[in-house]
Amino acid sequence: MPSGHNDKNANQESVEEAVLKYVGVGLDHQNHDPQLHTKDLENKHSKKQNIVESSSDVDVNNNDDSNRNEDNNDDSENISALNANESSSNVDHANSNEQHNAVMDWYLRQTAHNQQDDEDDENNNNTDNGNDSNNHFSQSDIVVDDDDDKNKKDAGVGVDDDHQSMAMAAVAAAYTLSKNNNNNNSIANDSNSRKRQHDNGNNHENSQKKRKNNNDDDDRQIGNVDPELTTLGDADDNDTNNDVIDRDQLVHKAIIDADSITQHPDFQQYLNTAADTDDNEKLKHIKDHLMRTHGLNHQNKNHNDDTDDLSNSTKQYSELQKDSMLDSSLNKSRNYMEVLPKVISQDTQPHQQKSPSHDNEAGSVDNSEISQLLQSAATKASSLVSLSSSSATPSTSRSNNSKAFDKAEDAALERFINEYEAIERLTRQQVCERIWSSDRPKDNFWNNIYKVLPYRSSSSIYKHMRRKYHIFEQRGKWTAEEEQELAKLCAEKEGQWAEIGKTLGRMPEDCRDRWRNYVKCGTNRASNRWSVEEEELLKKVISDMLEEAQQQQSQLHPNLLEEEQHLLQDDQNDHRNNDEDDDDTASAAAAAAAAIQEQQQLLQQKQQDDDDAIAAAAAAASSSLGDNKDEDKPHDSLGIQLDDNSQNSMVPAPSATSTHSKSLSNTIRRHNNKLRKSLMGNGKLDFKDIINWTIVSERMGGTRSRIQCRYKWNKLVKREAIAKIQTVKDDDMLWIFEKLRDLGITEDSQVDWDELAALKPGMKLNGLELKLCYERMKKKVKGYKQKSINEISKELVDYFSSNISMKTEN
């Protein structure tokens, strides 16, 4: 670096070197190839020696003085130009554009001047060589020398042109960048300009001293040196000094500020991709290992051996590089999602069987591992219900309790569905299609869902999942057109709800409920307030159905109970009389089996008779409805007259009488079969098994739909229960809330009120009445809406305990 550089430029020396590598060190009119440059210098030196030995005395003082004067003039012009440039920048910092234009003009002018000097030197050399050729050496030697010099100069000019072009590009870049930094660097430019002037003066003095020393050396050999070569050294020195100054200026102009580099997008991208350097370091270590393994020493082996070894090493290195990249990609992708089967196509049925060779190399798991993951997901989801119920862990035995699903149960099912989506790599739509699919792939999907809520029946979970995760676009309000289409379909396919739902694009359960709750009754369905007569009729219908169920129970179970008593008596006799033969027990068992078989035959015969009677009654009811038709007005499928305003609301079905009779007969038959199964099972009658609200609606004359009858009955029962619980004693209330407290449950929906009522038969309260007691008494607790049932029960226990204590004291 020149001595005149300031501290800031010295600190940026590494950056300058980087710029010099880009711009080119050949700004001093030298070739890029250092070997070629050295060889040219040796040739010139040998030619000088030959010319000195063969030349005669030639007077070259005048030429030398003239060349020196030209060099001095060039230096003066350079210094004056720089001083003028710096002085203009010191006068007005705001005029930055003129300063840079002056630098560009000076650089172009200096370049043109240097080219002109090179052409003049070439012409002078050609003239002098022609004059001296007759006295010192032959014409052929001169031609050879001239050709060599010309080729070298041509090569040098080509290289210089390239370097000058690159330098001009660098100056242009610095020129553009410096426009943005003029205001921030004005003070620094003032100090730099003063130092540069001082450095230029020192450089000029050093160049004069150097030329003087060279002149002294040349004077000692002046008598033996060719006149053409007397100024060769001076010209080289002058060009070197000028090029050093020019290069320093270009380097300073082309250096990018450090702040600009850090804010450059490419530099930020380099920082963001720093993680990729780890792989490059690994590859570098592999390459170094190969170099050490194969002993590639280029200094001790010839070129052929080096080429062969290097080619072999390159092949092995490329192979190891591929292996390394493959291993790294596999390691990165070997996560939880990659080891699972791929997502199936949208066009195919969800969860098709995977082939055994499916992505074995990528680390996919087989069916056994998938099954383990699903079981683990079911266990985790089931734990949510256990945690939400605090100390009360749900029973693992399944029950037929049809209470509503609470938030904890829905959260557990949702947790399993999310895990299932991740394991099988399916979308939510594909999972819903899987739930509604009629196929049953061997993936234990439903079995694992049932494990999430082990205390609920499989049918209740199945229905709840299909309601919650449906695949239908429409749910909710029905339009008049949809109801008309539903009426047409039900007239043809009543009971085939899957096909009807598929046609309408709705859930089968929605179609079924809409038909029997609203559309089936048509305009005959009343929507006004229930009258007293309607309430009494509803009570009579339900009372008759309960009485019929009790009659069936009395006909079936007395014989069965009698046979069971005989069997128990036989067992007791066996224990008392150990000496009796086992034949007596066998004969008693055989007799009991024969009696049961005979009873079953009687039941089958009675069932057939009942079915025939029901069919006859339905036909008679249909015929009576048909006889009362008014031919002047349209009728619905039940034979009910329609007003003129309601003709468009219902579509008459063909063969209405036969369709209604068949539907009613099938409904009654299914109800009786269900009731008999309950009686044959445990001998107990459940209200939900006895009462079929469709039959209730039919016995009400079709004036109220099944859902209206059910809602009205629940209100009537609740009204009577509220009147009954008014007489419940504090001791019974204390017992109720102590049991609720001991259960440790947190949600109202987790209580089985019927089982709770069975724990104390003497209290004579059913499950509904116990629930009403709780709902009535919890309002006495302050902030009961924000408290759990367990917290409410604790406070009510304290409340009734204090009441009982006060009554006892009084």
Swiss-Prot record:
Residues 497-519 bind DNA. The modification Phosphoserine is found at residue 355. It is found in: Nucleus. CDD domains: SANT (cd00167). GO terms for molecular function: DNA-binding transcription activator activity, RNA polymerase II-specific; DNA-binding transcription factor activity; RNA polymerase II cis-regulatory region sequence-specific DNA binding; sequence-specific DNA binding; transcription cis-regulatory region binding. Residues 1-10, 29-44, 149-161, 198-208, 627-636 have a biased composition (Basic and acidic residues). Residues 470-523 form the HTH myb-type domain. It comes from the Eukaryota. SUPFAM superfamilies: Homeodomain-like (SSF46689). GO terms for biological process: positive regulation of transcription by RNA polymerase II; regulation of DNA-templated transcription; regulation of transcription by RNA polymerase II; termination of RNA polymerase II transcription; transcriptional start site selection at RNA polymerase II promoter. The keyword Transcription applies. The keyword Oxidoreductase does not apply. Its main location: nucleus. There is a cross-link at residue 807 (Glycyl lysine isopeptide (Lys-Gly) (interchain with G-Cter in SUMO)). Keywords: DNA-binding, Isopeptide bond, Nucleus, Phosphoprotein, Repeat, Transcription, Transcription regulation, Ubl conjugation. Residues 692-717 form the Myb-like domain. Disulfide bonds: none annotated. Residues 1-80, 114-161, 180-243, 294-313, 346-365, 572-667 are annotated as: Disordered. Residues 51-64, 124-135, 180-191, 586-606 have a biased composition (Low complexity). GO terms for cellular component: chromatin; nucleoplasm; nucleus. Residues 346-355, 643-667 have a biased composition (Polar residues). It holds the Pfam family Myb_DNA-binding. Present with 7510 molecules/cell in log phase SD medium. DNA-binding protein that recognizes sites within both the enhancer and the promoter of rRNA transcription, as well as upstream of many genes transcribed by RNA polymerase II. It is essential for cell growth. May stimulate or inhibit transcription. Specifically recognizes the sequence 5'-CCGGGTA-3' or 5'-CGGGTRR-3' (where R is any purine). A member of the general regulatory factors (GRFs) which act as genome partitioners. Acts as a chromatin insulator which are known as STARs (Subtelomeric anti-silencing region). This is DNA-binding protein REB1. It comes from Saccharomyces cerevisiae (strain ATCC 204508 / S288c) (Baker's yeast).
